[in-house]
A protein has these predicted regions:
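N-terminal export and membrane-targeting signals
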Residues: 3-25
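C-terminal region of N-terminal signal peptides and the immediate post-cleavage residues
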Residues: 30-54
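Phosphate/oxyanion-binding loops and surfaces in catalytic or ligand/nucleic-acid-binding neighborhoods
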Residues: 43, 88-91
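Extracytoplasmic/lumenal domain signature
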Residues: 56-83, 88, 95-137, 142-237, ...
């Protein structure tokens, strides 16, 4: 699940054993009812609504006060709404792999960050304390247009920091934001132009960061342990979504959150938020508890959203869709409207196409009967609740750790679905029929999500090579390969002629076509 090289394994409590504790807490908060019990221990049709109390900001910027009448739109937005690669895979449906053009000939390295050395720090996992470097899974930088034609890159790294760079030069445009542990996964810039950044860390905290101060300033934190038990782990890997003023995010603590941000500006013109927890939903249900011997239910995928429904998957392979329309409008608990069990760990994000079909990739870790039956890449129709499976593909090649399947998020481009595998390589599948069109072998594992722009596939391998292939024909044709060093677990960001990608070798690189 996610980057095992940096995971802190925990002995997960059995949620059934925690029932007395949960019930006592719920009673104290005034939320004990049959619907809540069903949400936690049956089929999850009703979600747990958190207390309607105002969240207390953590590390708020000193000297800022809230206005008596909050602003409803930013006066000086960082970017036009939805412009740039503001979150993992570019949009709420997790379906934008990049924006061209993309180099078709061997590119040059424009810059390296840092110029020397690497982004490294020590962290502890089940094997002990050791040093980790670079950018890992999923690790896709945000690419944000700024005034006067400038671009800013924003990304987290294994030096425990979030970095903010001029995309043209690789120089820092803001001070790095230091966290308490590895800055894993991908983060999100506010899509509506507010100078806010939403970023998780392995130090148990998801942060909302103001970018209109002298240095990045944490306005609020969501702690993995706040409000209830942690089931499995306490990291934040998935990139949050901001939709209609609400933050949607899942944690490795096995809970899905909806937070109303209440964004605005104070009397000094500085951005402020007044977060209020609207819902906290368990990623498991009674059927999953009955089917699994362990309690590994963490959410490492980035929540996807389409037409009022939020979709996510967990490390037990349960894919769910929750209707949040009334949650947004009235603060009502979300209502589960879709359920499909993959049978094995599903860390890849759900991808939604323009017609509302879902594409989901999972791993082969436990080799359950269900995962053998379903396969590791599926197309689902959430409107067919009784039989949503449209087609499935087996990805049974075995790679690192004796495991198969995929950690990568699918790319759905044109009439083809592209998926990278733990065994090493990329598989192309007909989007309509599920028929395999071709397979491409690469040194594995290939955890980075495929990027396909203008008929060019860009994928990194675990020998430190970033490669490009022409995929407009019946078979992929190699265009170029450039060695960067260090396993490439992260997903490249392709934006208008440049490629930005980090490696486990310690650095982030900017590539562009040669003059």
């Amino acid at each position: 699940m996610g980057d095992r090289s940096v995971r802190r394994y925990r002995s997960a409590p059995d949620p059934r054993a925690l029932f007395p504790w949960l019930l006592a807490l719920v009673l104290a908060l005034g939320f004990a009812n049959a619907a809540l019990v069903r949400a936690l221990f049956d089929d999850g049709e009703v979600a747990l609504a958190a207390p309607q109390t105002r969240a207390v900001p953590a590390n708020a910027h000193p000297g800022t006060t809230a206005p008596t009448k909050p602003a409803t739109a930013p006066k000086r937005p960082v970017a036009a709404p939805k412009e740039g690669l503001w979150t993992f895979r570019g949009n709420a449906r997790r379906s934008l792999t990049g924006v061209g053009p993309v180099p078709r000939r061997l590119p040059r390295i424009v810059w390296r960050y840092p110029r020397t050395g690497g982004m490294c720090s020590a962290s502890t996992d089940e094997t002990g304390r050791s040093t980790w470097c670079g950018i890992g899974w999923t690790g896709q930088p945000n690419v944000i247009p700024r005034p006067r034609g400038k671009l800013e890159l924003r990304f987290g790294a294994y030096d425990r920091r979030y970095h903010f760079l001029d995309a043209a030069t690789g120089r820092e445009v803001r001070s790095p934001l230091l966290t308490g542990d590895l800055a894993k996964g991908s983060a999100t810039s506010d899509p509506d132009g507010f100078p806010l950044y939403y970023a998780g860390s392995r130090d148990n905290s998801l942060r909302v960061v103001a970018l209109d101060r002298r240095r990045p300033t944490v306005l609020w934190k969501l702690d993995s342990y706040a409000g209830g038990p942690v089931t499995w782990n306490d990291d934040w890997d998935g990139a949050p979504l901001v939709v209609k003023g609400h933050l949607l995010v899942g944690g490795e603590n096995s809970w899905f959150y909806v937070v109303k941000l209440n964004r605005g500006f104070d009397r000094h013109g500085k951005v402020r938020i007044r977060p209020r927890m609207v819902a906290r939903v368990p990623s498991w249900d009674g059927r999953l508890l009955a089917a699994r011997s362990d309690r590994a239910f963490s959410i490492e995928s980035s929540v996807a959203y389409d037409r009022g429904i939020a979709y996510f998957a967990n490390s037990a392979g349960l894919v769910q869709g929750w209707d949040v329309r009334q949650t947004f409008r009235r603060g009502n608990p979300p209502r589960r409207v879709f359920r499909f069990w993959m049978g094995d760990d599903t860390d890849a994000s759900v991808v939604i196409d323009e017609k509302g079909f879902l594409y989901v990739a999972s791993e082969l870790e436990q080799f359950t009967g269900r995962s053998r039956e379903v396969g590791q890449l599926v197309k689902l129709d959430p409107r067919r609740r009784g039989s949503p499976l449209v087609w499935s593909v087996q990805l049974r090649g075995i790679g690192r750790g004796g495991k198969g399947g995929s950690w990568a998020t699918p790319a759905v481009v044109g009439d083809t679905v592209y998926i990278a595998t733990n065994a090493g390589g990329v598989v192309a599948v007909d989007r309509r029929t599920g028929r395999t069109r071709w397979k491409l072998s690469l040194p594995g594992p290939t955890w980075g999500s495929p990027v396909v722009v203008d008929g060019v596939l860009v994928e990194g391998d675990c020998r430190g090579n970033l490669r490009a292939f022409d995929v407009t024909g019946r078979r992929p044709r190699a265009l170029w390969s450039i060695r960067l060093g260090g396993c490439i677990e992260s997903t490249p960001a392709v934006w208008r002629g440049r490629i930005y990608v980090g490696t486990r070798g310690g650095a982030l690189y900017a590539l562009a076509a040669r003059p």
